[in-house]
């Protein structure tokens, strides 16, 4: 079942080059989408989509039982509580984790294609995204989200790992170098 996530914050995007998790497993494109807990309409739509997939995969009689058995297992469920993570921007949000072995569509606001060189989308910006939920049986039941596409929506405060230095952080040593050469 496909769901469109409108105006959600992007975290840990790997949209242009596939990666492995901790150097293991299949190479995939991936991203997390942060959803404020106050956006109950979107959260309920996501949960309904997940329950729909559970019903299709395992039958309608045990939907709530299966949902409840996997919803608190981060290895078996794509929608998670951001309060359990110590990452920038996660507190007060749920996050939906999605991945795909195939490269997702990545477009700008005007639907033109984006590349890594464009610098958008980036971790911390706001995007629209489409995902598709699917159920699986692999040493137990689970529901994951396949990443289909991401559209840059608007700028946001970038999540960074410390950032890059600016020129203002350094002294101009050009005169000092000349003085050292003259003194020797």
Swiss-Prot record:
It comes from the Viruses. InterPro entries: Enc34_ssDNA-bd (IPR022595), NA-bd_OB-fold (IPR012340). Gene3D superfamilies: Nucleic acid-binding proteins. Transmembrane segments: none annotated. SUPFAM superfamilies: Nucleic acid-binding proteins (SSF50249). This is Putative protein p50. It comes from Acyrthosiphon pisum secondary endosymbiont phage 1 (Bacteriophage APSE-1). The gene is 50.
């Amino acid at each position: 079942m496909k769901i469109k996530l409108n105006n959600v914050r992007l975290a840990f995007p790997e949209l242009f080059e596939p990666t492995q998790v901790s150097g293991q497993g299949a190479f995939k494109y991936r991203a997390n989408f942060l959803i404020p807990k106050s956006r109950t309409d979107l959260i309920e739509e996501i949960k309904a989509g997940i329950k729909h997939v559970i019903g299709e995969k395992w039958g309608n009689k045990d939907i709530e039982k299966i949902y409840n058995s996997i919803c608190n297992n981060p290895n078996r469920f794509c929608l998670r509580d951001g309060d359990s993570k110590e990452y920038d921007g996660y507190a007060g949000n749920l996050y939906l984790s999605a991945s795909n072995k195939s490269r997702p569509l990545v477009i700008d606001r005007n639907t033109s294609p984006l590349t890594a060189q464009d610098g958008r989308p980036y971790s911390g910006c706001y995007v629209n995204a489409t995902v598709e939920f699917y159920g699986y049986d692999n040493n137990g039941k689970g529901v994951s989200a396949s990443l289909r596409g991401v559209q840059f929506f608007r700028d946001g405060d970038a999540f960074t790992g410390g950032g890059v230095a600016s020129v203002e952080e350094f002294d101009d040593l050009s005169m000092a170098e000349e003085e050292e050469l003259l003194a020797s």
